[in-house]
């Protein structure tokens, strides 16, 4: 049973401001044929129930409330819940509390700065890392895209409009705005995308095709693709749309012809699939490409974004590789293509898609543990995921009650955030189901500052607040440390063992040190950096 804390200044500082959960009113349909998010969730469950029955797959059990809460906070906001957020949800008795949590995190009109903006910032980071992956100087430059992407996600700009803005971005002649003076990161808006991917027609064509159409044509730059249907003429036909992208800058001319360096042939702009582009008067070649890309009839565009969102939320895409959609079999794409059609009918509404997936029973089922006999989950079954570098640090902020770092470089802990993320990026994988030992090792490397201070009785905000709270007994203190780190109560065996350990300490100082050791162990446990 959860202890109800009395109202005090310490309680508010330690546990944060509470969430007031309530049944959420259903939003009016903005598109006549779109499903509600609850209807979409049921549709997803029905389709996968049929697929699993055909494959004789036994559905995993639905997870408990604590696991769902932690999973949803991590997937939508990029960090674990605070202690107060965890208590509020776990003590909320409505049968609709899971759906209410999803709606609250995606769009709380009463307090957008608390949830919707956090969610938008997290998805901006996800999208930027997807568009410009890795830890190269170019990828670091792309951090300047985050403020612009956050604006798009905060406003819930339809995805087709967002991509159109990126593909048709124009130089506005204004100076770049500084985002992080210490790192020299600048905000160039959507034009920065082309600079970050190399600033040349061929790099732009390769990146746009992979990111937004789910196909990799880069291997066809110099020769026909050895494992796919793409020919060299397909690659340069796409590159011709970006003939005005040179040396990191953008020329808004309607140029639609290109000759490779040291080449003998001019290539004109051709859509993937072989149809020659006709550039209308008054339009640039990139505007013509954007019209084709975001068309409701394009079989790759909507399916690619649905597959990417699915990979983030479930842990793996509906196809083997989200960047090789063209290689997927019709059987693999059956549910994906049908879901993509519904996404189009919903007006390319990303918030609608995310909510529908998170409200489904499929999203709420237990992870499948991989072993020697099960090397990869069947479609729709989620693996255990590792947290991204940003998720690890932002979760540490929550667990340790640190001042929240900000992208403008003004917060005390931004240097530590950058250092931790940089180290973890060296060990992290773009595939969220791949766990690497480098992540807990990176945490250990940071013990000199973060986790050591966090478990120091004189410096730790969370630990000091728990130990000094007069209204928390031994059991409640242990519970609070678990909520702060694992977002769940201790299991019966954990509780029994740790309470016995605490109560064995003969004096107050040793008992306080026992709490510090427990907190250190929780922070450095693999469970802290895994999403189950």
Question: What is each of the regions a protein language model found here?
Answer:
Residues 1-5:
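Positively charged n-region of N-terminal signal peptides that target proteins for export
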Residues 6-17:
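Bacterial N-terminal signal peptides
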Residues 20-22:
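Boundary at the C-terminal end of the N-terminal hydrophobic targeting segment
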Residues 27-269, 301-340, 350, 354-467, ...:
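Short, structured secondary-structure elements
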Residues 266-278:
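Internal "kinase-insert"/substrate-recognition segments embedded within catalytic cores
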Residues 279-284, 288-301, 305-313:
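Structured secondary-structure scaffolds
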Residues 345-346:
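Localized edge beta-strand/strand-to-loop motifs within extracellular or lumenal beta-rich domains
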Residues 487:
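Conserved micro-motifs of the catalytic ATP-binding
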């Amino acid at each position: 049973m959860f202890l109800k804390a009395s109202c005090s200044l310490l309680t508010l500082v330690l546990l944060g401001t509470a969430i007031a959960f309530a049944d959420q009113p259903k939003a009016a349909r903005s598109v006549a044929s779109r499903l509600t998010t609850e209807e979409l969730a049921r549709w997803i469950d029905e389709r996968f129930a049929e697929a699993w029955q055909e494959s004789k797959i036994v559905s995993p059990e639905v997870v408990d409330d604590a696991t769902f809460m932690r999973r949803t906070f991590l997937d939508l906001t990029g960090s674990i819940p605070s202690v107060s957020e965890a208590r509020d949800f776990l003590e909320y008795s409505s049968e609709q509390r899971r759906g209410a949590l999803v709606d609250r995190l995606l769009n709380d009109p009463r307090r957008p700065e608390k949830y919707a903006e956090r969610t938008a910032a997290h998805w901006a980071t996800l999208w930027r890392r997807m568009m410009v992956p890795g830890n190269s100087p170019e990828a670091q430059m792309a951090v300047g895209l985050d403020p612009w992407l956050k604006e798009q996600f905060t406003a819930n700009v339809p995805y087709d409009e967002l991509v159109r803005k990126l593909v048709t971005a124009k130089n506005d002649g204004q100076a770049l705005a500084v985002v992080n003076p210490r790192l020299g990161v600048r905000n160039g808006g959507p034009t920065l995308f082309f600079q970050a991917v190399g600033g040349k027609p061929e790099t732009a064509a390769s990146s746009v095709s992979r990111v937004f159409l789910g196909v990799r044509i880069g291997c066809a730059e110099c020769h026909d693709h050895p494992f796919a249907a793409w020919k060299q003429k397909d690659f340069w036909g796409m590159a011709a749309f970006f003939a005005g992208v040179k040396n990191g800058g953008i020329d808004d001319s309607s140029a639609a012809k290109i000759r490779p360096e040291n080449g003998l042939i001019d290539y004109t702009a051709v859509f993937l699939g072989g149809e020659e582009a006709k550039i209308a008067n008054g339009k640039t070649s990139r505007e013509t490409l954007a019209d084709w890309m975001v068309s409701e009839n394009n079989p790759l565009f909507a399916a690619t974004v649905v597959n990417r969102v699915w990979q983030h939320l479930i842990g793996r895409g509906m196809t083997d590789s989200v960047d090789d959609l063209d290689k997927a079999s019709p059987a693999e794409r059956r549910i994906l293509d049908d879901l993509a059609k519904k996404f189009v009918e919903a007006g390319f509404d990303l918030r609608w898609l995310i909510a529908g997936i998170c409200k489904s029973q499929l999203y709420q089922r237990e992870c499948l543990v991989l072993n020697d006999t099960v090397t990869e989950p069947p479609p729709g079954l989620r693996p255990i995921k590792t947290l991204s570098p940003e998720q690890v640090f932002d979760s540490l902020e929550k667990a340790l009650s640190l001042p929240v770092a900000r992208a403008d470089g003004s917060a005390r802990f931004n240097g530590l955030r950058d250092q931790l993320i940089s180290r973890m990026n060296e060990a992290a994988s773009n595939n969220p189901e791949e766990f690497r030992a480098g992540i807990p090792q990176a945490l250990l490397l940071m013990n000199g500052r973060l986790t050591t201070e966090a478990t120091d009785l004189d410096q730790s905000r969370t630990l000091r607040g728990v130990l000094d709270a007069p209204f928390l007994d031994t059991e409640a203190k242990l519970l609070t440390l678990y909520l702060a780190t694992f977002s769940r109560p201790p299991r019966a065996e954990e509780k029994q063992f740790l309470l016995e350990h605490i109560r064995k300490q003969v004096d107050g100082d040793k008992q306080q040190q026992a709490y510090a050791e427990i907190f250190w162990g929780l922070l450095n446990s693999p469970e802290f950096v895994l999403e189950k």
